[in-house]
Amino acid sequence: MNKRRIAALLLCIPLIFSGGCSLITVDQEKADAVENAKVLAEYKDVDITKGQLVQYMRQTLAQQGTTLEDVQADESYWKTYLNSTLNQLVIDQIAMEKAIELGFDQLTEDDNKKIDEEFNSTVNSIEAYAEYIAKAAVEDDPTKNYDEEYKNVMTTYFDSLGFTQESYRDEVKKNFILKRVYDDVIKDVTVTDEEVKETYDSQVTIQEGNLKNQPSFVEMQKQIGSKVLVYPEGYMNVRHILLSFDDETKSAATTAYGEDNKSEYERLTTEGKAALQTKIDDIQSRLSAGEDFGTLMEEYNDDSLYSMEPYNTEGTEIGPYATEDIPGYLDAVAKLTKQGQVSEPLVTYNGVYLIQCVKMLAGVVPYDDVKEEMTATMLSGKKATEWDTVTQGWMDEAKTAGVLKVFPERF
């Protein structure tokens, strides 16, 4: 039992005979109920309460891997987040009203089948998780009951989402209907080839200017998720074969490297490479004979990342301004000057790398190579803008008509 729980129990001891702890609990529950009942928005005859907003926030933030408390701690962001999230609940309410007006709430057998498929897919994933946790709990403590553990995990998981298993299907159904409204609003939004080409040309000009002043700017673009259309010299896509040292050698070499013990590091990596020399020779010999690098990756590679797509065939972007933790990796890449070329063996604390240039990237990315991706990105952006414009119009109209009032300050 941790110290906080012990302290809480000790505080209750003097009150046990008078029922103090239970009274405190009841009082707190009443206070919470009053707080959660605060009305933050009124739309016609529908109230949106603080409790509803908090539940929605916790659901969406959990999917993003963060918490409401974390967001509230960021004072510069909290007010914006509060207003936008409250507005979203209002928009959902208005959109559901629109759905009924348009008949989108009338579901066919096929519609219900799609809803069930999405619901069952999610539940099946949760059930697999619950089975794993329950099994582990029983293996760790045989006195525990598997069915009870399984039920507890399922209940806890759905509680964290703010649903029961039954009410979650209603949520899936609601989102299905709201998606119909969204699709109706954005159905006429398009992007022309001329718009895409104009954006491409503009971005190329801007990026060329940025790279001329600061070539390392390419890495900033990648970090913020901006599409790179112009690459500095030395950039390429690469993939590699890693021949790993045994765990003991790898651990010792990593320690020696971290402690800057150069003589010990040299000894360990030299011995480690010697143990792998037969494999190195075989790979290099077969490459010289014209064998495909990808085939050798499948046979020899100890780096699991490169067993997955797109890394297996396309590799990863790298260049002189990239950040790379593997000692000597950037230097080895810098010596590759043409597509298909393979580096000399690079020895590190992990093992031995043989790196292949998959594609040279320096210069302007051809328009045809990015047209489809840019079109999809621009179309998505225009749809989002159209949705925001229309839904803001709904809210403005409702406020003007006196049927919508929003009170974020009551939170």
Where do the model's predicted regions map?
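Secretory-pathway/luminal and periplasmic proteins that interact with or process carbohydrate-rich
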Residues: S121-I133, Q207-N210, D303-N312
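Proteostasis/folding factors centered on peptidyl-prolyl cis-trans isomerases
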Residues: E139-N175, K179, D193-E266, E298-D303, ...
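Short, low-structural-confidence N-terminal segments
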Residues: M1-N83, N87, Q221-P232, D247, ...
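Soluble periplasmic/extracytoplasmic beta-strand elements of cell-envelope proteins
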Residues: K38-T49, Y56, K98, N237-S244, ...
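Surface-exposed patches in mature extracellular/periplasmic domains of secreted proteins
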Residues: D70-V71, E101-D111, L211-K212, D292-E299, ...
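Solvent-exposed, polar/charged alpha-helical surfaces in well-ordered, non-transmembrane soluble domains
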Residues: G51, Q55-Q59, T80-Q88, D92-E97, ...
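N-terminal targeting/tethering segments
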Residues: D27-D170
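Peptidyl-prolyl cis-trans isomerase
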Residues: T278-P327, V364-D369
